[in-house]
C-alpha cells in the first residue's frame, strides 16, 4: 500500500492516533509525540482514562468498536497501537486480535495507511529467544494465551495491505533512556534482553515517518 501519498506527511505535522494510550508505554508515546509537535488523538474508554494525557485530543470509545475507530481515525496520517492485555494463565485472550482486525478495517475505510504496532519478544518468529526464565517459566505459566493472541494480531497486520511495522520489545523496564538500542530481525544467538519503555516509545514514533523497517518486525533491545 506504500505510495507517494504515504509520504505526504513526512515534511508536515504528523497527525497520529494512539491506541493503548493509558498504559505505561502508551502514556510515554503520547507525551513524546506531543513533545515532537505531533497532532495526537487518543481513543480511550472514558474521560477519566484520558486524564494526564496532556496535549492529546481524547475520543471516547472502545478500540474494538468500528464506529469509534472510524471517528478517531478521521483526518489522521498514522496509527500507533500500544494495546496490551493482562497476563492470563487460564482464560482465552482475544482482545488484541479483535481490536486489530477492527482497526485494519477502519483504517482502510478512512484511507489511513501507516500502522506501527507493538507486540513483544516471543511473538511470531521471535518465540524461543527470550532467555531461560522468560521462555521456560514466565511464558508457559503466564503468557501463553496472551501470545497466542499476539501471534494472531501480527498475522492480521501482516496480511492487512497497510504500510505496517511490527515492533517487538524485549522485557520492558522503567529506567531512563539509553538512546542507543539494537533493532534485530536476525535473532541468531539472541536469548533475552531488556529495554526501557522510554526507548521503545522513541523507536515506535520514529517509525511514523521512517520507512527503514517498513513491512518488518524488528525485536528491539539494549
Predicted feature residues:
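Conserved beta-loop-beta element that borders a ligand/cofactor-binding pocket
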Residues: 154-175
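Glycine/proline-rich active-site loop of Rossmann-fold NAD(P)-dependent oxidoreductases
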Residues: 125, 176-181, 207-216
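N-terminal Rossmann NAD(P)H-binding glycine-rich loop of SDR-like oxidoreductase domains
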Residues: 16-36
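Conserved Rossmann-fold NAD(P)-dependent oxidoreductase catalytic core, especially the SDR/UDP-sugar
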Residues: 39-41, 45-47, 90-91, 101-145, ...
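SDR active-site strand-loop-helix element
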Residues: 19, 43, 82-83, 115-121, ...
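Substrate-positioning beta->alpha
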Residues: 95-96, 167, 195-205, 216
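NAD(P)H-binding glycine-rich loop region in Rossmannoid oxidoreductase-like domains
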Residues: 16-17, 48-102, 106-109, 208-212
Amino acid at each position: 500500500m506504500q505510495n507517494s501519498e504515504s509520504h505526504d506527511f513526512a515534511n508536515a505535522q504528523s497527525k497520529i492516533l494512539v491506541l493503548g494510550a493509558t498504559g505505561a508505554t502508551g502514556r510515554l508515546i503520547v507525551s513524546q509525540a506531543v513533545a515532537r509537535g505531533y497532532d495526537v488523538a487518543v481513543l480511550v474508554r472514558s474521560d477519566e482514562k484520558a486524564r494526564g494525557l496532556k496535549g492529546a485530543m481524547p475520543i471516547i470509545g472502545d478500540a474494538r468498536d468500528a464506529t469509534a475507530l472510524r471517528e478517531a481515525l478521521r483526518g489522521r496520517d498514522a496509527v500507533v497501537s500500544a494495546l496490551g492485555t493482562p497476563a492470563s494463565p487460564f482464560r482465552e485472550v482475544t482482545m488484541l486480535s479483535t481490536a486489530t482486525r477492527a482497526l485494519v478495517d477502519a483504517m482502510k475505510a478512512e484511507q489511513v495507511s501507516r500502522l506501527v504496532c507493538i507486540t513483544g519478544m516471543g511473538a511470531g518468529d521471535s518465540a524461543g529467544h527470550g532467555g531461560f526464565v522468560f521462555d521456560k517459566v514466565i511464558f508457559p505459566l503466564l503468557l501463553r494465551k496472551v501470545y497466542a493472541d499476539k501471534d494472531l494480531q501480527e498475522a492480521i497486520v501482516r496480511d492487512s495491505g497497510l504500510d505496517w511495522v511490527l515492533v517487538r520489545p524485549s522485557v520492558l523496564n522503567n529506567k531512563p533512556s539509553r538512546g542507543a538500542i539494537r533493532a534485530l530481525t536476525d535473532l541468531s544467538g539472541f536469548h533475552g534482553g531488556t529495554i526501557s519503555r522510554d526507548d521503545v516509545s522513541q523507536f515506535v514514533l520514529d517509525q511514523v515517518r521512517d520507512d527503514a523497517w517498513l513491512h518488518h518486525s524488528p525485536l528491539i533491545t539494549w
